[in-house]
Amino acid sequence: LSGLVGTAIHYSGAFLSYPAVTFMDALMARFVLNGLTGLLVGFLVLGGIIVGFNLTVILNGWAILNALGMMFALALGIGVLNCYLFTRFPLWQRAWAILMRPMFILSGIFFIPENVPSRYIDAFMINPLPHLTSEMRRGVYATYDAVHVNSLYVYGIALGCMMLGMILLLRNHKELAEL
């Protein structure tokens, strides 16, 4: 989602030529459309598994909502910052794609953070993605206790990236539209 938001100005160049359309319109349209699409797909997959296999589950709705909130906030924050960086420095988009490959492995999808050795856990949890996956696990698995989740940390990173990206975009959006 952050990658799609990051390319909003590039792909909305024709719309940005209209005086009534701003870069914020392009960012928010891209975020809302792709965010709701991803949410619907996730709901259908999870719901389909539960109904298809006739599972009895105890879902923690607050933990799921918190995980989704962290995910959307982080995607928007990093997406807004990358929107500036991708447009201003085209090479950054390729570098970002290369850097994010190992981040997928280190996001806590294939293993749980509680199994990481104690001497590495602090370094591992610098990455905000394990916080998301652990919080979602807490919402789906009733017996899972997400000890290392720090929601404020994730929301803080998201807000910081969003603020920095907005400052850069507000200062340079006319220049970026010409690139």
Language-model regions, residue ranges each:
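Transmembrane helix boundary and interhelical loop/hinge segments in multi-pass membrane proteins
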Residues: 1-23, 28-34
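Short cytoplasmic-facing helical segments at TM-TM junctions of multi-pass membrane proteins
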Residues: 14-16, 62, 179
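Alpha-helical transmembrane segments and their short interhelical loops
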Residues: 23, 28-96, 146-155, 159-166
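Helix-loop junctions at the membrane-solvent interface of multi-pass transporters
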Residues: 51-52, 110, 114, 171
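Pore- or pathway-lining transmembrane helices of multi-pass membrane proteins that form conduits
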Residues: 90-109
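Short hydrophobic, aromatic-rich alpha-helical segments embedded in or entering the lipid bilayer
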Residues: 105, 109-144
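Short cytosolic juxtamembrane segments of multi-pass membrane proteins
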Residues: 170-179
